[in-house]
């Protein structure tokens, strides 16, 4: 826990005081790093189990200055089932709180549904996607429409060409 307060504990306490909630929504801007999606799913599952109702974690997507956000929003149920939105894609996740199978993704890519004993696997392409999204969003937000590449033939040039062509 990176915070002085514990919002999940506070919501649990409200429940003890008679407050009834159908779900909890967390609007997040959690920066990307390798294996972050597994941590995010574990946090959402833990929150849903503690709260005894669905926990929805909506995460930002795209590049913002020197930070990258992979999206991958999560809906977790108290039984550990989780629905995960696609990485690096903007879209709308429509939640059906009664059934993971009823959730709908409007956008590119597809939802993943994980059973309570399944872990999310970070895709091997995540790092490349992060670099491409970061460079693309930086150029778009900075008004850069053309880039000149100086290529020497080394591995770094091959990587630069690969990113530029994506």
Model-derived regions: residue spans:
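Conserved G/P- and acidic residue-centered "switch" motifs that form tight phosphate/ATP-binding loops
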Residues: 154
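Enzyme catalytic cores with a strong preference for nitrogen-chemistry domains
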Residues: 1-150, 158-166
């Amino acid at each position: 826990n990176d915070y002085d307060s514990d919002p999940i504990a506070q919501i649990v306490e409200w429940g003890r005081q008679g407050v009834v909630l159908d779900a909890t929504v967390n609007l997040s801007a959690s920066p990307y790093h390798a294996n972050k999606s597994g941590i995010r799913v574990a946090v959402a599952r833990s929150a849903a189990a503690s709260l005894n109702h669905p926990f929805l974690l909506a995460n930002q997507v795209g590049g913002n200055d020197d930070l990258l956000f992979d999206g991958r929003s999560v809906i977790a149920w108290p039984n550990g089932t989780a629905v995960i939105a696609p990485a690096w894609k903007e879209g709308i996740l429509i939640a059906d709180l009664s059934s993971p199978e009823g959730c709908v993704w409007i956008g590119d890519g597809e939802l993943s549904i994980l059973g309570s004993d399944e872990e999310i696997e970070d895709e091997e392409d995540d790092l490349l996607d992060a670099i491409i999204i970061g460079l693309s969003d930086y150029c778009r937000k900075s008004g850069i429409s053309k880039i000149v590449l100086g290529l020497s033939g080394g591995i770094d040039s091959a990587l630069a060409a690969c990113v530029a062509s994506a």
